[in-house]
Amino acid sequence: MPQTLTEKILSRASGKNVSPGDVTEIKVDLVAFHDLTGYHVIEVMEDVGTLKVFDREKLVIAFDHLAPPPDVRSAEIQGQIRNFVKKTSVPNFYDINSGILHQIMIERYANPGQVIVAADSHTSTSGAVGAFAQGLGASDVAAAVITGKTWVMVPQPFKITLEGKPARWINGKDIALKILGDFKADYFNGMSLEIFVKEPSAVPMDFRATVSNMGIEMNADALMFVPDQETFNYIKTARGYEPQMVTPDSDAKYVDEYNIDLSKLDPLVAAPHSVDNVKSVNEVEGTPVDQVFIGSCTNGRISDLEMAAKILKGKKVKTRTIVIPASYQLFKKALELGYVQTLADAGAIITYGTCGPCLGGHFGIAGPGETIISTSSRNFKGRMGSPDAKVYLSGPAVAAATALEGKITDPRRL
């Protein structure tokens, strides 16, 4: 029987053919957690009386939400996790100088056809390379760490096809917001989105990571880009080996299909206070902004920083602007390419890979009555600080243009 990518991955992981609606136990290929959720995972393991790790090579731990620790409790939590790492001899541990977990996963670990679970909702980012990646609660992740297994209800497969080439200032965020605007945030519950790209080079891995990252904002059980030449090239270049490709059968059946012509996309913005309150940038243009944030595991990659640097080169920002590359590896690359210098000369504050203001943690949280535009993933009340702040979401081009003018600006006008 023809299988979708979802069905192929979960059939392999369960050891039997599965269909949408089946509830089955599956083996996981990778498990991960970060500082904010990791100590809960460890507490669950301690409660059941074991610190056993099913395979130390398949557990990835990164400090990102509380990096560097902004308070004593955060430092204490990180100390507890470091002790766990020492006791279990887990080799894949990334301390505060490494970056955001989800970026580390796609840089170093995630492969097509894998099952990945982690204690964070944006685990879906690894779907960029064609992995079935889900965020789970601490108890389920603890069970996966101990046993190497979890359970899943096989989701309904939904096919999305991207065709055409995006215009100059269009980014993966615009693709994600287009889907959210057309379907709303609760539409894809119980579904797995499989995205096909007709011209693979038109949607680079950075764009794919952004869209996959926001799969959870679409309420999808998983979001995966079907592996293609872009996937192959990315992994071979980044890691030096040729990945094993897993793709759906050509005659596989989907619950529904949806096409996007990338050449017709305009820069989009999610207005307060919901990710699916999507508008063309022209509809909100001119809105005064107190702070701009360019970064996060959603839009803190090289192409994002490149867009911002091109817009800000030789100019000065008119409002507070914070730039945070998603990993230390990306920070060094941006430094090498001159983007850090360009952004610093423009007046931006730049730091290394950390979640920071995205979750209202530190490094620039929003104050009462302030208006923020951010390239991160969520804009509900209180997400980035004060519940009295307003957060707009956009891609890096709109964010950088806004920093330049001090008000929401269409980058095509510059």
From Swiss-Prot:
The keyword Aminoacyl-tRNA synthetase does not apply. Its EC number is 4.2.1.33. GO terms for biological process: L-leucine biosynthetic process. Pathway: Amino-acid biosynthesis; L-leucine biosynthesis; L-leucine from 3-methyl-2-oxobutanoate: step 2/4. Its cofactor is [4Fe-4S] cluster. Binds 1 [4Fe-4S] cluster per subunit. One of its GO terms (molecular function) is 3-isopropylmalate dehydratase activity. It catalyses: (2R,3S)-3-isopropylmalate = (2S)-2-isopropylmalate. Keywords: 4Fe-4S, Amino-acid biosynthesis, Branched-chain amino acid biosynthesis, Iron, Iron-sulfur, Leucine biosynthesis, Lyase, Metal-binding. It comes from the Archaea. [4Fe-4S] cluster binds at C297, C355, C358. It is an enzyme of class 4 (lyase). PROSITE patterns: ACONITASE_1 (PS00450), ACONITASE_2 (PS01244). InterPro entries: Acnase/IPM_dHydase_lsu_aba_1/3, Acoase/IPM_deHydtase_lsu_aba, Aconitase_4Fe-4S_BS, Aconitase_4Fe-4S_dom, HAcnase/IPMdehydase_lsu_prok, Homoacnase/IPMdehydase_lsu, IPM_dehydratase_rel_enz, IPMI_cat. SUPFAM superfamilies: Aconitase iron-sulfur domain (SSF53732). Heterodimer of LeuC and LeuD. PANTHER family: HOMOACONITASE, MITOCHONDRIAL (PTHR43822:SF2), HOMOACONITASE, MITOCHONDRIAL-RELATED (PTHR43822). Catalyzes the isomerization between 2-isopropylmalate and 3-isopropylmalate, via the formation of 2-isopropylmaleate. Belongs to the aconitase/IPM isomerase family. LeuC type 2 subfamily. This is 3-isopropylmalate dehydratase large subunit. It comes from Sulfolobus acidocaldarius (strain ATCC 33909 / DSM 639 / JCM 8929 / NBRC 15157 / NCIMB 11770).
